[in-house]
Swiss-Prot record:
This is Probable gas vesicle protein J1. The lineage of its organism: Bacteria, Bacillati, Actinomycetota, Actinomycetes, Kitasatosporales. A minor component of the gas vesicle, might be involved in nucleating gas vesicle formation. Gas vesicles (GV) are hollow, gas filled proteinaceous nanostructures. It is not clear what function GVs perform in soil bacteria. It is found in: Gas vesicle. It comes from the Bacteria. One of its GO terms (cellular component) is vesicle membrane. InterPro entries: Gas-vesicle_GvpA-like, GvpA, GvpA-like_CS. Belongs to the gas vesicle GvpA family. Its main location: other. Pfam families: Gas_vesicle. It comes from Streptomyces coelicolor (strain ATCC BAA-471 / A3(2) / M145).
């Protein structure tokens, strides 16, 4: 004869969640964690740190309007190329102003 367990099942009857399921759900829906740290001395605010953490998939982040990695030269080769192209054009224009006859026009790619 079996006796029923006295401890409840933490996930409910017949439900189980493994790490992959939890991670998939978090990345699909997204999670925001926010917190502030303030250091005061005699009612004088010395330091305030505001923490904001968003955990989401790239697709979900883009859906929310977060795409800073696409324009950050440290993270995107396309952004670095665009930045260098703009800088090159500005330098060519400056050279043209200084010595109009010496700098050739940019060739079309």
């Amino acid at each position: 004869m079996t006796t029923p367990s006295r401890l409840p099942d933490p996930y409910g009857q017949g439900q189980s969640a493994n790490l992959a399921d939890i991670l998939e759900r978090v990345l699909d829906k997204g999670v925001v964690i926010a917190g502030d740290i303030k250091i005061n001395l005699l009612d004088i605010e010395l330091l305030t740190i505001k923490l904001r953490l968003v955990v989401a998939s790239v697709d979900k982040a883009k859906e929310m309007g977060i795409d800073w990695w696409e324009s950050d030269p440290a993270l995107s080769s396309r952004a670095r190329h665009d930045e260098l192209t703009r800088e090159n054009a500005a330098l060519r224009e400056r050279l043209r102003e200084l010595d109009p006859g010496r700098v050739p026009r940019e060739e079309a790619p």
